[in-house]
Amino acid sequence: MKVIFVVQGEGRGHLTQALALRQILLHEGHEIVKVLVGKSKNRKIPEFFLHQIDCPTELFDSPNFLPSKDNKRFCLLRSMAYNSLLVPSYISSINFIRKNIQESGADIIINFYEVLCGITYSLFHFGIPEVCIGHQYLFLHPSFQMPGKYPLPEFLLRVFTRITCLRATKKLALSIRDYGDNAANGIKVVPPLLRQKVKTTIRHHGNYIVGYMLNAGYAEDVKAWHQKHPHTQLHFFWDKADAPEELQVDETLTFHRINDVKFLKYMAGCKAYATTAGFESVCEALYMGKPCMLIPAHVEQECNALDAEREMAGVATDAFDIDKLKVFARGYEEDVEFRMWENYAEIRIMAAIDSAYNEYYDTTETCVYDEKKSNITIASFFQS
């Protein structure tokens, strides 16, 4: 297969999923012909992704959430108003995606939760299948229970998720556990997409806590806790664009610009992990046997945090209160079942993509055959 990736560039998760699937596809003898990544002026695509994807990569403007004034949580109304002003730019992006798909010669589109790709695929008939991948498709599964605390944002999240997969051939819902497939909605539940490096990195339990924050405003919370507990070693990662590669506040607190190799190294050796409830890094911590604390920044992360708590993978809280993480870590037990589930990820995900590919082209051939048969019948009628 010749494959084109379209990836949402917000945060780290979808980018690392694309890297993981790239490894699987190449191992199976397939080819990634092009990678398109949605970007915004508020986020910089990490260098580790641009270096490791090793494929012609182009960026396009895409909708994103704007943080609140304190740069912690996301502001829904502000984000909607901001993105509405950029509609002309997004229309240009849709045309850009259309042109690149048509010129790529790809046999299949893999969409990593990019909304403009969902719209593009619904508007134009490319004659190739689209498989959508993301943990967010679990929100459309009838067995998944939403938090229920924010009815309107939860409704809008589901609407947004449906737009990302309009007319999609298949939706792969990445999940911590097996909810079972939902054929009526075209949802296939599969293990998370973790890179091989996550599974092969030697892990041990050190004496420091590692963290990742999507919004840099949480740095003040970390500093405030650190002032009260200066003897606890902290290493926090962020994607603050104007920050140095390493900002050492003092001997026991360091902020690192997101660097994937360094992040996995620190994760493998930490005592526990604190994060703004992104799905991917929580799964990495879960696989490595690290207790987690999750601080949701928006409704999607509220869903992630609730799911993690249900699976006893972590504890949710409103702020970077690392005392809560320490208490949770004392009674934490590694989830062996998750590791077994995750070890089947490559087989299950590849089988789902192959199935979508074959079903699409088998159906297309049948439709073409039926159309030809119909045309012959009509021609025979007029000739008689």
PLM feature spans:
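A short, glycine/small-residue-rich beta-strand->loop->alpha-helix junction that serves as a flexible
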Residues: 7-19
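Conserved nucleotide-sugar donor-binding subdomain of glycosyltransferases
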Residues: 72-108, 115-116
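A donor-sugar binding/catalytic signature common to diverse glycosyltransferases
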Residues: 109-112, 265-304
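Active-site-proximal region of nucleotide-activated glycan assembly enzymes
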Residues: 124-189
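Donor-nucleotide binding loops and adjacent catalytic segments primarily
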Residues: 193-269
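Nucleotide-sugar donor-binding patch of glycosyltransferase catalytic domains
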Residues: 247-248, 291-335
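C-terminal amphipathic helix plus adjacent low-complexity
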Residues: 327-384
